[in-house]
């Protein structure tokens, strides 16, 4: 219904308010700065522990749908910013991004001085749950997969 679509649009604007539109500066010697991480397009996880993460799942697909539904290109443009930004820390041979093995994706990317765990700004926290990060990126990089699954 149109009402549901309008509510989805409002919710998307709220969710987008948690995404970075600028790049946090990192000091020389901080791992994230040394590998050239750009925070634009990353979502802030919470106001309490203030780190960025790849918690995206179907959000980019929803933004692309909203872009078409409302003829609003900013939604799809920011979905592309999110998508390209999330690719930065994909570890592969020669570009491990501070991760020990290819195929793992870092979680709890610390971009502020607020440190609720270990390592501090410019590093990953020692808390690491690779399962959900892989699931989130799988959804982001295979658009339409969930819809196709539920249509079966």
What do the PLM-derived regions correspond to, one by one?
Residues 26-54, 95-136:
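Carbohydrate-binding/catalytic loop surfaces
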Residues 6-30, 73-97, 152:
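Long, well-ordered core segments of solenoidal/helical folds
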Residues 1-4:
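Short, small-residue-biased leader/transition segments that mark boundaries at the very start
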Residues 51, 146-150:
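Hydrophobic alpha-helical membrane-insertion segments, chiefly the h-region
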Residues 14-17, 21, 65-68, 85-88, ...:
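Positions within ordered alpha-helical repeat solenoids
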């Amino acid at each position: 219904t149109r009402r549901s679509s309008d509510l989805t649009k409002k919710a998307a604007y709220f969710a987008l308010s948690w995404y970075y539109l600028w790049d946090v500066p990192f000091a020389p010697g901080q791992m994230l700065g040394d590998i050239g991480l750009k925070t634009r397009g990353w979502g802030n996880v919470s106001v309490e522990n203030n780190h960025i993460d790849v918690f995206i799942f179907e959000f980019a697909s929803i933004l692309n749908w909203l872009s078409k539904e409302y003829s609003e290109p900013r939604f799809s443009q920011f979905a592309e910013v999110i998508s390209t930004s999330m690719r930065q820390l994909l570890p592969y041979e020669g570009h491990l991004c501070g991760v020990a093995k290819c195929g793992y994706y870092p979680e709890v990317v610390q971009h502020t001085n607020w440190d609720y765990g270990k390592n501090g700004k410019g590093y990953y926290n020692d808390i690491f749950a690779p399962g959900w990060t892989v699931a989130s990126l799988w959804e982001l990089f295979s658009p339409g997969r969930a819809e196709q699954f539920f249509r079966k």
